[in-house]
């Protein structure tokens, strides 16, 4: 019995790995490189669920990917941060980033209320839009006690919209006259995922990409204080409602902070850093596959339309406002 359980666990884990690896490699191909590995992974998983059903017998391995590998990926995500660079070179961008995070969450909740959408998904999308997309959503989902299907829907939406917006940014840069500093800063402070920032920022050249990444990593850095604030708010609400559900700091966020400090104070060989970043990406993709397998098409039809409209409106407002601020500061 135990050997059969282990076999089913390994099959479930292998399934998420194969789809993740395929998505990772497919995203390096022309055209698909614009779509992004996250979007590919989630779409394949949802389509698999639709045509083959949820592989219940292999759920232990799939759940392992959606929970533990996701948290491990977020821990390694901290290696992207160098706190000295963000606070030193990117102090002006960091100030904008604070406004971006606050605006994204508040605006998302406001639009969601007008559309009578799901508040939990709106919160996840607000944090994802303001901070760093899928990783941020996955990091705060336990704090909000979000369901896996809501987390998956939010990640799928933000991956899709972020890809579309990054392509729109490149078109705007190609058509209109814009300095590399303005374009890079605008991309960095307003696009959703690091991959989206790399896609759009890289179109403006190496100087634009450098500024874009500095702006984006400032938002990733803000995940640390943001999660602390969210935990305190949820604890306060929990005590007010006399709930016994205690909100604790997720251990993987502590690991995220430790990795950020390690990358700040310790010189890690670039070859090792590249390997760790690849491992982080694969683990994150495996988690996305596992989350995507929990989403049925009827869930998308019933729960995704209003959040999709909400994030589009919020992202347009954020991009417009961010451009005005960046143009004023960098022109």
From Swiss-Prot:
Keyword Transmembrane: yes
Pfam families assigned: Cons_hypoth698
Annotated membrane topology: Multi-pass membrane protein
Membrane spanning stretches: 9-26, 31-48, 69-88, 93-115, 122-144, 154-176, 183-202, 217-234, 247-269, 273-295, 308-330
Compartments in which it is found: Cell membrane
Keywords tagged on the record: Cell membrane, Membrane, Transmembrane, Transmembrane helix
GO cellular component: plasma membrane
Keyword Transmembrane annotated: yes
Disulfide bonds: none
Coiled-coil regions, chain positions: none
Family the entry assigns: Belongs to the UPF0324 family.
Protein name (Swiss-Prot/TrEMBL): UPF0324 membrane protein SAS0317
């Amino acid at each position: 019995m135990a050997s059969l359980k282990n076999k089913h666990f390994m099959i479930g884990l292998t399934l998420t790995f194969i789809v993740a690896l395929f998505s990772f490699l497919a995203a390096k191909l022309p055209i698909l490189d614009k779509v992004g590995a996250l979007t590919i992974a989630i779409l394949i998983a949802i389509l698999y669920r639709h045509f083959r059903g949820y592989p219940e017998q292999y759920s232990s391995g799939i759940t392992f990917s959606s929970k533990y590998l996701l948290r491990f990926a977020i821990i390694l995500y901290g290696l992207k941060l160098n706190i000295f660079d963000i606070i030193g070179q990117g102090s002006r961008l960091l100030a904008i980033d604070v406004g971006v995070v606050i605006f994204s969450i508040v605006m998302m909740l406001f639009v969601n209320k007008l559309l009578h959408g799901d508040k939990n998904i709106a919160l996840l999308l607000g944090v994802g839009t303001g901070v760093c997309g899928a990783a941020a959503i996955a990091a705060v989902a336990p704090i909000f006690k979000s369901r896996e299907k809501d987390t998956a829907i939010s990640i799928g939406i933000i991956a899709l919209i972020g890809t579309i917006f990054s392509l729109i940014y490149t078109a705007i840069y190609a058509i209109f006259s814009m300095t590399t500093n303005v374009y890079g800063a605008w991309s960095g402070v307003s696009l959703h995922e690091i991959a989206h920032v790399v896609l759009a920022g890289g179109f403006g050249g190496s100087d634009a990409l450098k500024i874009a990444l500095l702006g984006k990593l400032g938002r990733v850095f803000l995940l640390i204080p943001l999660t602390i604030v969210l935990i305190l708010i949820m604890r306060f609400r929990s005590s007010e409602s006399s709930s016994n559900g205690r909100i604790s700091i997720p251990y993987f966020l502590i690991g995220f902070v430790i990795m950020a400090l390690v990358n700040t104070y310790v010189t890690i060989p670039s070859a090792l850093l590249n390997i760790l970043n690849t491992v982080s990406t694969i683990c994150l993709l495996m988690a996305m596959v596992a989350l995507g397998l929990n989403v049925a098409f009827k869930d998308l039809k019933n729960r995704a339309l209003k959040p999709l409209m909400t994030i589009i409106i919020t992202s347009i407002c954020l991009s417009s406002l961010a451009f005005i601020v960046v143009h004023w500061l960098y022109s």
